[in-house]
């Protein structure tokens, strides 16, 4: 999770809007941190960095990673572990890795869609209704660790 301090001093996080036809008209609980499956022999922080670059099309900013722990996604099978890094980036220039799915359903036609179709900066309270429900805990943990406003 990339965070920054906005012009008004508010804590902001970068989230990606999930791609594909199911999510195209959704906003509530349709945004996520970049995430993905760990490859064999890979440590979770390396997975987070690799997935960020695959889903955003840019490497994460350099900086000290702050562990945010893990959450269990709805359905209970997928555990997501996250870190936060302070940084800034142009979210208008993302190039997300595509995935394939049959669309329309039962058509037999495979189509490609981006994992994220766009990214955006959100203040924490604006992010809450938009982020995938289980990942909202990461917002709370980030505020606990870095505070709601910059120190100094």
Question: Which functions belong to the PLM regions below?
Answer:
Residues 30-34, 40, 85, 147:
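Functional cleft and adjacent loop/helix regions within the main domain
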Residues 1-33, 83:
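N-terminal strand-loop-strand
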Residues 120, 124-152:
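Charged phosphate-binding loop/patch that engages nucleotide di/tri-phosphates or the phosphate backbone
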Residues 37, 71-72, 131:
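Structured beta->alpha junctions
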Residues 111-117:
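Non-DNA-binding regulatory cores of transcription-related proteins
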Residues 33-68, 123:
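The catalytic Nudix box helix
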Residues 7-9, 20-23, 39-40, 76, ...:
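Short, charged/polar surface micro-motifs in flexible loops or helix N-caps
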Residues 70-108, 120, 142:
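Active-site-adjacent beta-strand/loop module that shapes the phosphate/pyrophosphate-binding cleft
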């Amino acid at each position: 999770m990339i965070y920054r301090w906005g012009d008004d001093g508010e804590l902001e996080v970068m989230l990606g809007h999930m791609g594909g036809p199911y999510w195209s008209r959704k906003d509530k609980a349709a945004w996520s941190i970049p995430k993905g499956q760990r490859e064999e022999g890979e440590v979770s922080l390396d997975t987070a960095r690799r997935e960020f670059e695959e889903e955003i099309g840019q490497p994460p900013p350099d900086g000290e990673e702050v562990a945010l722990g893990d959450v269990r996604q709805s359905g209970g099978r997928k555990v997501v572990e996250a870190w936060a890094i302070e940084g800034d980036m142009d979210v208008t220039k993302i190039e997300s890795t595509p995935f394939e799915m049959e669309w329309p359903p039962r058509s037999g036609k495979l189509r490609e869609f981006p994992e994220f179709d766009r990214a955006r900066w959100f203040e924490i309270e604006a992010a809450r209704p938009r982020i995938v429900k289980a990942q909202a805990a990461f917002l709370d943990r980030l505020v606990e660790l870095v505070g709601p406003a910059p120190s100094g």
